[in-house]
Amino acid sequence: ADTIVAVELDTYPNTDIGDPSYQHIGINIKSIRSKATTRWDVQNGKVGTAHISYNSVAKRLSAVVSYPGGSSATVSYDVDLNNILPEWVRVGLSASTGLYKETNTILSWSFTSKSNSTADAQSLHFTFNQFSQSPKDLILQGDASTDSDGNLQLTRVSNGSPQSDSVGRALYYAPVHIWDKSAVVASFDATFTFLIKSPDREIADGIAFFIANTDSSIPHGSGGRLLGLFPDAN
């Protein structure tokens, strides 16, 4: 199975798999059952910003999700990624819909990793302020596609309307050196802007930023509440 560390923007509470009874952001370590969550209210049809950072000295993974002029939601969890992730990883964005639906549109995405070691100054930086129609630097999986407006659509959209039972992911093509033999782990920052929109009152399921082994693919049956990340709810 894939090794996944993720930050979820979860728009539908699945209390049967340990979700709180409200929309939330969460930190997931190798399981859809979040290690830490905080309440988050999605604003239907508004552009939001998610900022994820890992401090490799403090060994703390943090996320802040906000809307312009609104309040922000913050969650953090202490974890040593050296013990969890392989030495080389890929970073990606994932989203899903199930019975309920929403657009999972990404308008921009940036990432920077930086090693704390002077010996291994291998770092990676990328910025997408828009997405080309046939992106050579992205690995698109499942229903993910780029549209003529320069946006990344992680799940299926038809004539501007979100579709149910859809799952898609986009990974940056170049692997990231997340730690080396001296056990020095890279710090990183990721930011993406997103638009979640639905004509329905009930929406689902959410967007996640994730880090995985370089050959990671969408697990079979991982749509809906599993956000395209995990094969089951364990």
UniProtKB/Swiss-Prot annotation:
Binding site for a carbohydrate: Y12, L99, Y100, R225
Protein transport recorded as keyword: no
Entries under InterPro entries matching the protein: ConA-like_dom_sf, Lectin_LegA_CS, Lectin_legB_Mn/Ca_BS, Legume_lectin_dom, Leguminous_Lectin
GO molecular function, one term: D-mannose binding
Record PTM: The alpha and beta chains are produced by partial proteolytic processing of the lectin precursor by an asparaginyl endopeptidase.
Residues that coordinate or bind Mn(2+): E8, D10, D19, H24, S34
Residues annotated as binding Ca(2+): D10, Y12, N14, D19, D205
Top-rank taxon, per record: Eukaryota
Gene3D superfamilies per record: 2.60.120.200
UniProt keywords, alphabetically: Calcium, Lectin, Manganese, Mannose-binding, Metal-binding
SUPFAM superfamilies, A to Z: Concanavalin A-like lectins/glucanases
Family designation: Belongs to the leguminous lectin family.
SUBUNIT field: Homotetramer.
Other remarks on this protein: Binds one manganese (or another transition metal) ion and one calcium ion. The metal ions are essential for the saccharide-binding and cell-agglutinating activities.
Role played: Glucose/D-mannose specific lectin.
Name this polypeptide is given: Mannose/glucose-specific lectin Cramoll
